Regions:
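Iron-associated oxidoreductase/ferritin-like identity signal
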Residues: 1-159
């Protein structure tokens, strides 16, 4: 059985993952509305991944005989001034999520809950990938900044 503290924190993380999914869906829809179908696809894939992360955590709580408590998902921003701004916000957000995951790992370590610590290793590694992916996209968009043909090509590659 999980400690009450870890159980509550994982339920909060489920909400954070679903909020992340909602954010990336909003980014996808905004990119699509501006004609960036490839960027929209990139964020759509992120939306699916974040839902998977929440599902993994829900399954984990169920496997440990703990109740999943779904809470309301807070409203997200729905418009951005540029594709670059979307990716910059993505990186900032993923850094926040990394902090949340690290907090879960710290609680599990404090509780000497080795099963939870082991499960969280996947999330820790995933966050390294998420931050790297966002940084890579910032670099790519900055590389073509001001070049409409370059942005068109980048968008096609992401489709």
């Amino acid at each position: 059985m999980l400690s009450e503290k870890l159980h509550a924190a994982i339920n909060e993380q489920i909400n954070a993952e679903l909020w992340s999914a909602y954010l990336y869906l909003a980014m996808s829809m905004d990119a699509e509305s501006k004609g960036f179908k490839g960027v929209a696809n990139w964020f759509y894939v992120q939306w699916l991944e974040e839902q998977d992360h929440a599902h993994i955590l829900m399954n984990y709580l169920n496997s440990r005989d703990c109740k999943v408590t779904l809470k309301p998902i807070a409203e997200v921003r729905t418009e951005w001034d540029s594709v670059l701004e979307m990716y910059q916000e993505t990186l900032r957000h993923e850094k926040v999520v990394t902090g949340l995951i690290n907090n879960l790992a710290a609680i599990a370590a404090e509780d000497r809950d080795f099963a939870s610590s082991n499960m969280l290793v996947w999330f820790i590694n995933e966050q390294v990938e998420e931050e790297e992916s966002a940084r890579d996209m910032i670099f790519a968009v900055e590389a073509v900044e001001g070049n409409k043909y370059g942005m068109y090509q980048l968008d096609k590659e992401l489709a």
